[in-house]
Amino acid sequence: MHALASQLHRGAGFTHVTGAQMRGWWLPPLPTGLPEFAAQNSRNRPRRPELRIIRTTPEPEISRLRGLPIVASTDILLALARHFGLLDVVVVLDSALHLGDVTPSQLADALTARRFGVRRLRLAATLADGRSESPYETLLRLLHVACDVAVVPQHELREDGRLVARGDLWILGTNALHEYDGVGHRSRDQHRSDLRRDRDIGATGWVRRGYTDLEVLRRPVDILRDADRTLGRDHDPSRLDAWYDLLRGSCFTAAGRQRLLARLGLGDPMAAP
């Protein structure tokens, strides 16, 4: 990276996927072989196959991160929104908000700009929530929202003033918590802790349901069925149509990753219409 940085013109900085990775933001699964990305205002740009230059107007604001030039966080988000699907942008935006790299006021200012990517970023801002603590928590939340299930992230369940648990998602108006169970929940010690936590939640009369990436990506109907039952409404799988639309346009699918390559001019534009 330092070798590439030495090739950048003054006033240029890393952006897009490269900038997000430098800041430690969550990203969707990405295609292999992506170049590094930098932004600059100058027409003259270094020509290297491993570096993609994105021209921006006005000239980007540059700071230093671990000795490398990087554009402002809002500029990174706008650059990603030029090429990412909506679901992908929400995942990254949730991460930036969660880490405090973007404040609500900074985001609001960025959304007034006449820049490439601003329309998708505006839409993502209506769906974003910095309380998410992982990318799949974001996906689980958006699945519920797309199915018209109102949820509250990071809900604190208390009894007699004592904190029993903090749940990923509370289905509003019910006694049900829906949570994402990632790889970290598979160790023996964590499994024991989870079982103890489940018993504590059950003792209060609440229900805790855990889901993995399998349900979120491939069997979302299982999650919807649980939510419909909890809400006491008829189960209607067509409610998932909006979720499938979001998913198809994202890098969480092979077609979405191919579409990203096409948008970047790096793949076959006919491979993902």
Show where each model-derived region lies.
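Surface segments flanking catalytic/ligand-binding clefts of nucleic-acid enzymes
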Residues: 97-273
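Short gly/ser-rich loop at a beta-strand->alpha-helix junction or flexible surface loop bordering the NTP-binding
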Residues: 1-117, 232-273
